[in-house]
Amino acid sequence: MDELKKAMKIAFAIKAQNFHWNVEGPLFPQLHMLFATVYEEVYGAIDDFAENIRKLGSYTPASFQRFSMLTQVEDELNMLEDRAMIAELLQDSDKMVKLLKIVFDLSEQAGEHGLSDFIAGRMDAHRKHSWQLRATSKE
């Protein structure tokens, strides 16, 4: 169950929103929109994560302390240059895909096919984020 809770991605969404708010440089318009697309899409799935956790009979994490204990994403306290923001968010998105794959495999083993379907959709969304970030980082 902790793997599913780790996959909720609160910290990832907050980081993408931080980058959306604070990006600067010649790519500002494009990156501002890209980071918004990422954080809005991720935030949009958080309630579904919580409901899937509840369907399995567990309580959802609902405090900053609990989220920080579960996160797989490092907090970014410094203001980064635009290229570093892309690289860091890409690395985190790739981490999320790996974590989601673990959750997918566990849900399949448990016969929780509805959860597997949801997680497969989340993996696809993060692969798309990774692709867009990777393509944006090309010189």
Model-found features: residue ranges?
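Short, helix-capping/interhelical loops that line the mouth of catalytic, cofactor-
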Residues: 22, 59-81
